[in-house]
C-alpha cells in the first residue's frame, strides 16, 4: 500500500513538472513506463485531481473564512467541487512570476479590476467565459475580457467627532482644508483613492476625474504634506485612528465600519464622494482546475453570496440585483446601498491598469 501511494504521488508530481516544462518528455515517458502506467493516464489523473477543487488566491485572515462560507459552501453544493486557499496574497508581480514559471497552482485571484487590464494583454490571464459568468450581475464597465468585479470597496474617510463637534467635515474639500479643520490626516500611500480625493477637493467633479490630472492632484496632496501621515495596510490605519494619532483618515469603508464600532462612535465614517473600487476575480493563465473556475465565479455573483460577503467582510455587492436587498443595519456602510449610491464616484480600472505604475511612483516621490 505504501509503495502504491508513493508511485501515485511521484507520478502526479512528475506530471506537473512535465506540463510546467521542468521535465522533458523522454524522462517523463521513462518514469511512466517504469511504473507500468501510460503517459496519457497519468496526465488524465493529474487533471482529474485538479478538477476536484478550485484554489482561490487571496489575502488570508478573515477573507479566507468569509469566502469559504459565503461562496465555497454554495459552490460545493452546486458542483461537488471543493474550495482551497492560497493566502500568500496575489500581488501583480507574483501572478506574473507564477504564470511565467509554468507552475500555476491557483485558479482564481482576489484582485483589483485594474490588474485585469495590465495582466490580460500580456498573456498572464485566462479570459472570462461570459457564457457562464454574467455581465449583467456587475456594474456597467466592470465586466472586462480578463476580469469581472465581484464586490466593491470604497475609499471614504473617518473623522474624530470630539475634534470637530457640531461642524464636522462632509466631503473631500473639507478633508483637505487644514485651516477650517485642523489636525493630522492619514492618506493611503499607494496613491489609489488619494489622487481622486485630492482632485475632488480641488474642484474636479467626480464624473470628470479621468484621465487623472497628476500635477494638479499631487500639488493638492503636497499642500497638506506637513499635516499628513501615510498608511500601507488596513491594520496600520486602524491603529493610527484608534490610538488618536490622526483627526481624519482616508480609509476603506469596511474598515470605517469597524472603526466606528471600536471607538464607540468617536470616529465617524463619511461615504459622501467615496471612491468605489471594483474588487475582481481574475484567472491565472493555465489554471489547474480549467473551466471549473468559471462556475465558482458565477456562484460569487449570486445574491446570497454577495450579501454574505457584505455581512462578513463589509464588502459591498457589485451585482445590481443585490442593491435593494442590503439589510437596513448595513445601509450606512455599503456604498451601493440606497443611502449612499447617489453620492459615490466610480474608479476607472482601464486608466489605472495602463497608468497605475507611473502614478504610484509619482505619488511616492511627491510625499517623500
Regions from the language model: what does each represent?
Residues 61-68, 104-242:
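Extracytoplasmic ligand-binding site segments that recognize negatively charged/polar headgroups
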Residues 307-368:
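C-terminal capping/gating helix-and-loop segments adjacent to ligand/active sites or protein-protein/ligand interfaces
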Residues 20-27, 36-50:
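N-terminal twin-arginine translocation
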Residues 66-67, 153, 180-193, 215-223, 262-287, 300-323:
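Periplasmic-binding protein-like
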Residues 156-163, 199-204, 277-292, 297-299, ...:
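A bilobed periplasmic-binding-protein/Venus flytrap-type ligand-binding module shared by bacterial periplasmic
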Residues 50-117:
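Early extracytoplasmic/lumenal segment of secretory-pathway proteins
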Residues 1-23, 27, 34:
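N-terminal secretory signal peptides
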Amino acid at each position: 500500500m505504501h509503495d502504491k501511494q508513493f508511485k501515485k504521488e511521484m507520478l502526479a508530481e512528475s506530471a506537473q513538472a512535465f506540463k510546467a516544462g521542468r521535465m522533458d518528455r523522454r524522462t517523463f515517458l521513462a518514469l511512466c513506463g517504469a511504473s507500468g502506467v501510460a503517459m496519457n493516464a497519468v496526465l488524465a489523473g493529474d487533471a482529474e485531481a485538479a478538477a476536484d477543487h478550485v484554489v482561490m488566491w487571496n489575502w488570508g485572515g478573515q477573507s479566507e473564512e468569509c469566502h469559504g462560507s459565503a461562496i465555497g459552501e454554495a459552490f460545493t453544493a452546486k458542483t461537488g467541487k471543493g474550495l482551497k486557499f492560497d493566502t500568500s496574497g496575489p500581488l501583480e508581480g507574483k501572478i506574473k512570476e507564477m504564470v511565467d514559471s509554468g507552475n500555476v497552482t491557483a485558479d482564481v485571484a482576489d484582485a483589483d479590476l485594474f490588474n485585469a487590464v495590465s495582466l490580460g494583454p500580456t498573456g498572464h490571464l485566462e479570459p472570462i467565459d461570459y457564457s457562464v459568468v454574467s455581465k449583467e450581475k456587475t456594474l456597467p464597465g466592470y465586466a472586462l475580457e480578463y476580469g469581472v468585479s465581484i464586490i466593491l470597496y470604497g475609499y471614504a474617510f473617518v473623522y474624530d467627532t470630539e475634534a470637530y463637534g457640531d461642524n464636522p467635515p462632509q466631503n473631500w474639500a473639507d478633508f483637505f482644508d487644514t485651516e477650517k479643520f485642523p489636525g493630522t490626516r492619514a492618506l493611503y500611500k499607494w496613491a489609489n483613492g488619494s489622487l481622486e480625493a485630492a482632485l475632488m477637493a480641488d474642484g474636479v467633479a467626480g464624473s470628470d476625474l479621468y484621465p487623472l490630472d497628476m500635477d494638479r492632484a499631487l500639488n493638492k496632496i503636497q499642500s497638506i504634506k506637513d499635516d499628513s501621515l501615510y498608511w500601507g495596510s488596513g491594520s496600520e490605519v486602524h491603529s493610527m485612528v484608534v490610538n488618536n494619532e490622526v483627526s481624519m483618515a482616508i480609509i476603506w469603508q469596511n474598515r470605517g465600519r469597524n472603526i466606528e464600532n471600536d471607538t464607540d462612535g468617536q470616529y465617524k465614517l463619511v461615504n459622501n464622494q467615496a471612491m468605489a473600487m471594483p474588487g475582481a476575480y481574475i484567472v491565472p493563465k493555465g489554471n489547474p482546475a480549467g473551466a471549473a473556475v468559471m462556475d465558482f465565479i458565477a456562484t460569487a455573483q449570486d445574491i446570497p453570496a454577495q450579501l454574505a460577503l457584505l455581512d462578513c467582510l463589509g464588502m459591498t455587492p457589485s451585482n445590481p440585483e443585490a442593491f435593494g436587498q442590503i439589510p437596513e443595519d448595513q445601509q450606512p456602510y455599503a456604498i451601493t446601498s440606497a443611502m449612499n449610491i447617489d453620492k459615490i464616484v466610480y474608479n476607472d480600472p482601464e486608466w489605472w491598469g495602463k497608468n497605475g505604475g507611473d502614478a504610484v511612483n509619482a505619488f511616492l516621490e511627491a510625499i517623500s
